[in-house]
Amino acid sequence: MQPMPLLLRQSLRSSANFARTSLPIRPQFLPAAGPNLQPAREIQRSFSVCVRCQFRSQSPLYSSPEKDTSKDDAATQQSKDGSSTLTPGDESAKVEPDAETQRPSPAAGEQDTLQGFYQDAKNEPKRESAEKKGLPSYLEERRSQLSKQFTEMMDNLQSNIFVAGQRLNDLTGYSAIEALKKDIQLQEERLREARQRVREAKNAYAAAINRRSASQREVNELLQRKHAWSAADLERFTHLYRNDHTNEVAEMETQEALSAAERESEEAAAQLSKSILSRYHEEQVWSDKIRRMSTWGTWGLMGVNVLLFLVFQIAVEPWRRKRLVKGFEEKVIEAIEKEKAINHIEILKPQPALTSTSPSSKEEAAEPTPTSTAAGDTPTTDESTPAATDETITSEPVVWDSDPIPTFVTNITAEIATETTEDSAPKSATINGVEPRKSQLSRILPPLPPPTSLDSWRHTLNELFSDRSMVITQRDLTTVALQSAAAGAAIMGLVIALIRPR
């Protein structure tokens, strides 16, 4: 029979091993009630009788991780050394914290479960919205929302347009005329009611007259046969005589009512006509003011057109002319360069053919070599200069289609080639040929005077009234015609405004 401490130790070890082997990968959420409530309470137990075991279980609270490992090693060594001196109660207290430290705390598992639940709860509306987007009810609801928004926008647009019109009427002074219109409508309604009362009063007055006349006729008939009255005739006569005064009073009242209704109708008609005349006068004043404003606006537009015309003629037109001249110069220089390159190629092209024929042709081909070297910007003799000049001048000119520049360009090219061969300029100046071309262009095109001098104005006037031919587009012609018409209208309007008597 084993002693009690050994049995207790074995039972505790077996329970600790069972707890290690049956540990799940992810702790499940424990129910609040049931037969597993007692083990949960045992797992949540975090105290022990042994002070050393308590310190071991709570060592992360008192030290850093590096020191904790050293302390754990020292504690395990001390536990191995002093295992024989421990009491059974100490051993049981030691085994229980080991099992508790190896088992994960249920709070962490519950926290993970709650986090997963919260994530699912957050993602569930997104999934539901994604599923509902394809449903007909969702599309119908979306369409109804869009239609409501469109209706609201249109209502706001109408109100905004009305408010804008009201503000415009306030600025132009038409709001008073609108008030007069409303007053006229009220007066028309009042006149209509007054005329209706006049008709009713006339009918009542006519009825009272008829009633009194009928009573008087009956009285006269009774008086004519007075000698044959019966008791009923006497009572009838008495009744008619008594009602005659009442009929007379009713006739007078209806007559007065008719007169009052007629006076009221006349007053309403007079007030209506007065309001109509006032509205007509105010509308005339408003139309005159608008016409005056439109006249001043027209004059302002005419002035702006005249100012733009003057600015265009004084500032823009010279700048455009200068730009056109500059572009023309660049095009002429480019054409000269192309012509020179073509002439140079034509001069150098026959050399291979001549060298491949015979030795005599080689000797003859040696003669234009100085010319080519002269074209290549090397000094030449006086004998080679005429040949190069003749070849350059007599070379085929470039064919231009419907352009007046070809002869002009070929002449300038011939002069430039002559000057370059005679002067034998340096290599860089001969290749570029800028100075000779500029001199030729300055010789052909007269220099323009400064834009601020009197000669510039004289030159501009001469250009405006010169006989030189120009190519103009339909748009420019239409623009000039419209500007001229606007300027003429402005001048004539100014003259009429000055001459018109006040």
From Swiss-Prot:
GO terms for biological process: inner mitochondrial membrane organization. Residues 65-74, 91-101 have a biased composition (Basic and acidic residues). The keyword Transit peptide applies. The chain crosses the membrane at residues 296-316, 479-499. Residues 317-478 are mitochondrial intermembrane. It holds the Pfam family She9_MDM33. Disulfide bonds: none annotated. The keyword Transit peptide applies. Homooligomer. PANTHER family: SENSITIVE TO HIGH EXPRESSION PROTEIN 9, MITOCHONDRIAL. Belongs to the SHE9 family. This is Sensitive to high expression protein 9 homolog, mitochondrial. It comes from Aspergillus fumigatus (strain ATCC MYA-4609 / CBS 101355 / FGSC A1100 / Af293) (Neosartorya fumigata). The gene is she9.
